[in-house]
Amino acid sequence: MSRSSDLFHKAQTIIPGGVNSPVRAFKGVGGEPVFFKSGKGAYLTDVDDKQYIDYVGSWGPLILGHCHPKVIEAVDNVLHRGMSFGAPTELEIQLAEKIASLMPSIEKIRMVNSGTEATMTAIRLARGFTNKNKFIKFNGCYHGHSDSLLVKAGSGLLTLGIPSTPGIPQSITEHTLTADFNNLEQVAQLFEKYPNDIATVILEPIPGNMGFILPKIEFLKGLRELCDQYNALLIFDEVMTGFRVGLHGAQGLFGIKPDITTLGKIIGGGMPVGALGGKREIMSFLAPEGPVYQAGTLSGNPLAMAAGLATLKEIEKINFFEDLSNTTNKLTEALADAAENANIPFFAASLGGMFGFCFTDKNSVENYLDVASSDEVLFKKFFHAMLAQGVYFAPSMYEAGFVSSMHGDLEIQKTYDAAELVLNQLKSA
């Protein structure tokens, strides 16, 4: 038995499912998870001393790779002065100013501890600011595990939210409305049905938890127009896309300004973090300036602020995102070439340092159902075979992957060689 397997069995006796976040348990691909002990650059090393090219990147935060010297130095400098004070620090101002200077829609920003906190607070703020209760989310878009946002889509066009986990009363999600991503008509119908009741529309501008879905520009523009028409707020959940797909987030790439933006991952440089920001008059509705309450013991803690600030300074450098995008494109092209050589249907897409792929003969993937209809059995086989070759992709067909600035031509070539070997083996099996 490997040490990884031994640790997993031990973990299951003391931690529910043996993990502290469900996707890590490999339920989406079967088998047992790998336990890691270290990371450096584009690589992870497991507890059995096997090395992997890492395309998970701690689920997005590590855009500079593991243990980037500038981030380590920044954290080390702060660490010896104090890890948390529960009081304001200058670093909070510095990171807030840096984010506001880069993110087009943000005039004021509040730091929290996770993406879940950020989206939960954003919904509360939107409801408080508009004095309305209902909101629209999209099937397959994940916004953390707060009760009102953890909703499974119903079968009807205008179905009210149904909790997707025990422990959430129907009364909590009765104000959650759902629609299909990239389907503006469904959103318009929801507004027509509830013209005075919808506080906000929340979405990942590029969903990363139902694969990797690029939005139709007309869809995003239409959402902005509908929100303006019905006096609702538009929330972009850029926890994943913020500073990952471009220096100014997805909103900068697409030229759409939301009223509220939620952030996380990269702005903490690998430390736990979250944030929400937006128009001055909306953000001023948060306590202690306004009536909408939000608080957090470790919000704005110095370690996360230092790591985030160091990360943002690095990604501001000339050609950073051009180089990152080129590397990511090379990766998806390499995977597509390997699949084509094996005559296996395959679709991949990428933007900035974010990508996704699935085994399908579709020429485009536009929503959750498109991803769900792809070949999940083949994905599972591919995942495990690539893992055996030392390539670590996300252990779920529905999760996006991530490339860091430390990935280069060598890693792409190794990945291509492994994929070509694996796909030919799977084709002939």
Curated annotation (Swiss-Prot):
Its cofactor is pyridoxal 5'-phosphate. Its EC number is 5.4.3.8. This is Glutamate-1-semialdehyde 2,1-aminomutase. Belongs to the class-III pyridoxal-phosphate-dependent aminotransferase family. HemL subfamily. Pathway: Porphyrin-containing compound metabolism; protoporphyrin-IX biosynthesis; 5-aminolevulinate from L-glutamyl-tRNA(Glu): step 2/2. The lineage of its organism: Bacteria, Pseudomonadati, Pseudomonadota, Gammaproteobacteria, Legionellales. It is found in: Cytoplasm. Its main location: cytoplasm.
